[in-house]
Amino acid sequence: MKLMVNHQTHYRYTQVARNSVQSIKMMPQSSMHQSIENWHISVPGQYSCQRDAFNNLWITATQRHEYRYLTIMAQGVVDLYATELGYVETDVSPMLFLQRTMMTCCDLSMLDFAQAVVKVKDRKHLILLSEKILQQVQYQPETTSVTTCAIDAFHARQGVCQDHAHILIAMCRGLHLPARYV
């Protein structure tokens, strides 16, 4: 299946911005699951490409001029190949995704919640856990921020999609199931 991608990120500032730096991670690579037929990133200012520890390409862009609006655009054509659900890249150990982060720690009440739902560590029960998290933690815009951790959002019983993702990841890792945000 071929996908034509046109992704745009628009920044609008209430005050003039200057001397900003963006890390742009919108550079897909060809693999056994997809072929990148063409890809282009459009970003104002100067930029350079590098690779991270997982060999992913990313761009660092700098804007030295004053501005109030900034648009970053990624466009291209990707040919996707049929794959099974649940595929894990073989060059990265899934055990890496058991590592806790500040945003994805799991306390005892969260672990109890997860264990009550996940009787068997299978896909069906993990989907059920995700549904139970959505029931427990109501989606409420502007109630959390990018610095809100999974524990705080879980106990506040409200948050946004990133909080739901962090809570699910934290609980999976608490159950010794590798999990990551993709």
What is each PLM-predicted segment?
Residues 1-112, 176-177:
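Linear, non-domain "peripheral" regions
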Residues 38-40, 55-56, 70-72, 141-145, ...:
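Short, charged low-complexity intrinsically disordered segments located at boundaries
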Residues 82, 92-159, 167-169, 174-175:
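Secondary-structure boundary elements
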Residues 164, 173-182:
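Active-site-proximal binding-pocket segments
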